[in-house]
Swiss-Prot record:
Disulfide bonds join C103-C181. It is found in: Cell membrane. Belongs to the G-protein coupled receptor 1 family. Opsin subfamily. Expressed in retina and brain. Expressed in a subset of retinal horizontal cells as well as a small number of amacrine and retinal ganglion cells. Also expressed in a small population of neurons in the suprachiasmatic nucleus (SNC). GO terms for biological process: phototransduction; visual perception. The keyword Membrane applies. It is a multi-pass membrane protein. It comes from Gadus morhua (Atlantic cod). The gene is opn4a. Residues 359-385, 404-448, 479-503, 539-561 are annotated as: Disordered. This is Melanopsin-A. Photoreceptor implicated in non-image-forming responses to light. Residues 371-385 have a biased composition (Low complexity).
C-alpha cells in the first residue's frame, strides 16, 4: 500500500506543479494579453446586454426567428462574463491562481458557452432554410413551443460535450501561458485524441458543413424565384409575387445570420487548427504564444454580434436609439421636423374645419327658424315660385405652402373683391330701378339663404383648398323663372314660362368661355324657396385636384379660407 500511496502523492504533486508552473515569457506578454482580454470582456458584456435589452423591450423584435438571436446573445454574454475576469486576473499574476477546481470550472463554462454558440448558429441556419425553401412545412412546424424546445436541445447538446472531460473522457488543464484552461488536446493519449476528434467533428466541422449546405440552397431558391418572376413578367400570379416578397424578407434575416456565422467561424478557425495540429502528434512545435493567441481570438467572437446587429439590423438600431439616450446617433431622425410640421399643419386645418362646421350648423338652424316664421307671416302664396340665381365662378390655382403665404394672397385679393362688389352693387341698383321691389317676406327668405350660402362656402374653403375665388364673371341672370306646368306671374309682371334672354345668352357662351380661358367654371344655384337648401358642387382640375366654390360674400365676413 505504501508504494501506491507514494505514487498518488507524486501524481498529485505533479498535477499541482502543472497548475502553478509559470511559463518563461516576458511580463509584458502577460500584460498585453490582459489588456486585450479586458477589452473583449467589457465589449462582450456590454454589447450582448444591449442586444438582450433591445429584443426584450421591443415587442416587434420578439418574434420566433429572433428567439435564436436572443439565445446567441445570452450565450455570448455568459461567455464574456465568466471567462474574461478570471483570464484577466491570471494574466496580471502571470500564472493560474484559482487551483485545479477553478481551472475545471473555468474550462467547463468556456466549453459550454462556446459550443452553445456554434450549435445555436446551426439552429438559425436550419430555421432560415425551412422558411425559405419549404415555407408550407415551416408554417406547420414553427411555433413558440417548438422554438423553445429547439433552444433547450441546443443547450443540452452543449452540456453533454462539456461534461465529458469531467467524467473521465479527456480532462481540463491550463493552456498557453498558463493563465487559462481548456480540454487537454496536447497530451497524446487515446482518451484525449478521441475526444478531440469527436469534438471537432460534431461541434465544428459537421455543423459548418450543414450551415454551408443550408445557405447554398437558400441562395438557389431565391435566385429561382427571381428568375421565374422575370420570365413570367406581367403574367406572374399574385401569389408568386407575395411569395417572392416573403422570401426576400426572410433572406434579409438569413443574411444577418450568415454574417454572424462567418465571423464566428473565422474566430474559432485558428483555435481549431491548433487543436488538429496537436491531435496529429505535433504538439511540440506549438509555442505558448501559438496556443494563447488563438484562444484570445476565439473568446473575441462574443463581441462581434452586437456590432453586426447595429450595422445591419435597422429595428435593433432604432430600438437602442429610442431606449438609450447616449445611443441616439445609431438612428438619427432627419425627418422629425418635417413630420412634426406636417402633423401640426394637418391639425390646424382639422381644427379650422371643425370650428367652421359648428358655426354653419348654428347658422343653418337660425336660418330655418326665420324661414318658418316668414312663411307663417306672409302665407304660402308668396313661395309658390322659386327664384334661382345663376352665376359662374372663375378660379385660379394657388400654392398651398404655408398659412402665411395663403393669408397674404387673401389680403391682396381683398381690394380687388371690394372693387368688384361695388361694381356689382351699382349694376344691381340700376336693374332694381326698372323692376318692382319684391315682398318683405321674399327679402327675408333670400337673406337667410344667402347667409347659409356664405356659411357653407366658408366650410368648403376651410379645408386645404387648391383653388381660390379671385373674381366673379357674371351677375344675376334672371328674376323670373317659374315652375313647370304653372302659369304664374312674378313681381315684375313677366309670364312665368318666359325665360330670360340673358340666361340663354349666358348658357350659350359658357362652353366658348371655358375653351377660350381654359379655366374650370361652375354654376352655383342658390334657391330662395322655403327649404333654403344650398348645393355645393366641386370642379376637378386637369391634374385631378378638386376645386371648391367659394362665395365672395363669405370672404368678406370670414378671414379663414
Amino acid at each position: 500500500m505504501r508504494p501506491s500511496t507514494d505514487t498518488m502523492e507524486a501524481d498529485t504533486a505533479a498535477t499541482h506543479r502543472n497548475f502553478i508552473t509559470k511559463v518563461d515569457v516576458p511580463d509584458h506578454a502577460h500584460y498585453t494579453v490582459a489588456f486585450f482580454v479586458s477589452v473583449i470582456g467589457t465589449l462582450g458584456v456590454t454589447g450582448n446586454a444591449l442586444v438582450q435589452f433591445a429584443f426584450y423591450s421591443n415587442k416587434k423584435l420578439r418574434n420566433l426567428p429572433n428567439y435564436f438571436i436572443m439565445n446567441q446573445a445570452a450565450s455570448d454574454f455568459l461567455m464574456a462574463f465568466t471567462q474574461s475576469p478570471f483570464f484577466f486576473i491570471n494574466c496580471l499574476n502571470r500564472e493560474w491562481i484559482f487551483g485545479e477546481l477553478g481551472c475545471k470550472l473555468y474550462a467547463f463554462l468556456g466549453a459550454l458557452f462556446g459550443i452553445t454558440s456554434m450549435i445555436n448558429l446551426l439552429a438559425i441556419s436550419l430555421d432560415r432554410y425551412m422558411v425559405i425553401t419549404r415555407p408550407l412545412e415551416a408554417m406547420k412546424w414553427n411555433s413558440k413551443r417548438r422554438t423553445t424546445i429547439a433552444i433547450l436541445l441546443v443547450w443540452l447538446y452543449s452540456l453533454a460535450w462539456s461534461l465529458a472531460p469531467l467524467v473521465g473522457w479527456s480532462s481540463y488543464i491550463p493552456e498557453g501561458l498558463r493563465t487559462s484552461c481548456t480540454w487537454d488536446y496536447v497530451t497524446y493519449t487515446a482518451s484525449n485524441r478521441s475526444y478531440t476528434m469527436m469534438l471537432c467533428c460534431f461541434v465544428f466541422f459537421i455543423p459548418l458543413a450543414i450551415i454551408s449546405y443550408c445557405y447554398l440552397f437558400m441562395f438557389l431558391a431565391i435566385r429561382k424565384t427571381s428568375r421565374d418572376v422575370e420570365r413570367l413578367g406581367i403574367q406572374v400570379r399574385k401569389s408568386t409575387i407575395i411569395r417572392q416578397k416573403s422570401i426576400r424578407t426572410e433572406w434579409k434575416l438569413a443574411k444577418i445570420a450568415f454574417v454572424v456565422i462567418v465571423v464566428y467561424v473565422l474566430s474559432w478557425s485558428p483555435y481549431a487548427c491548433v487543436t488538429m495540429i496537436s491531435w496529429s502528434g505535433h504538439a511540440n512545435i506549438l509555442s505558448p504564444y501559438s496556443k494563447t493567441v488563438p484562444a484570445v481570438i476565439a473568446k473575441a467572437s462574443t463581441i462581434y454580434n452586437p456590432f453586426i446587429y447595429a450595422i445591419i439590423h435597422q429595428k435593433y438600431r432604432k430600438t437602442l436609439a429610442d431606449k438609450v439616450p447616449c445611443l441616439r446617433f445609431l438612428a438619427p431622425n432627419k425627418r422629425k421636423d418635417c413630420t412634426s410640421s406636417s402633423f401640426s399643419g394637418s391639425s390646424y386645418r382639422d381644427s379650422v374645419i371643425s370650428r367652421t362646421s359648428t358655426a354653419i350648423r348654428r347658422q343653418s338652424t337660425a336660418a330655418s327658424r326665420h324661414a318658418s316664421a316668414s312663411k307663417t307671416a306672409a302665407g304660402a302664396s308668396s313661395y309658390s315660385s322659386s327664384d334661382r340665381v345663376f352665376g359662374d365662378v372663375e378660379m385660379d390655382p394657388i400654392d398651398w405652402r404655408s398659412g402665411a403665404s395663403f393669408r397674404r394672397h387673401s389680403s391682396r385679393g381683398s381690394t380687388r373683391r371690394d372693387r368688384l362688389l361695388k361694381k356689382q352693387q351699382m349694376e344691381r341698383t340700376n336693374k332694381s330701378a326698372a323692376h318692382k321691389q319684391p315682398s318683405p317676406s321674399t327679402k327675408m327668405s333670400a337673406t337667410h339663404c344667402k347667409n347659409k350660402t356664405v356659411s357653407s362656402s366658408v366650410n368648403m374653403a376651410a379645408a386645404p383648398p387648391q383653388l381660390v375665388l379671385i373674381r366673379k364673371r357674371s351677375q344675376s341672370l334672371t328674376n323670373g323663372l317659374s315652375d313647370a306646368g304653372k302659369k304664374t306671374t312674378v313681381a315684375n309682371g313677366t309670364p312665368g314660362n318666359h325665360k330670360s334672354k340673358s340666361a340663354d345668352l349666358h348658357f350659350r357662351n359658357l362652353p366658348a368661355l371655358d375653351q377660350a380661358l381654359n379655366v374650370p367654371r361652375i354654376i352655383v344655384i342658390s334657391p330662395t324657396s322655403e327649404d333654403c337648401l344650398v348645393k355645393h358642387e366641386s370642379s376637378f382640375t386637369d391634374d385631378g385636384s378638386v376645386g371648391t366654390v367659394v362665395d365672395e360674400d363669405s370672404l368678406e365676413d370670414n378671414d379663414v379660407v
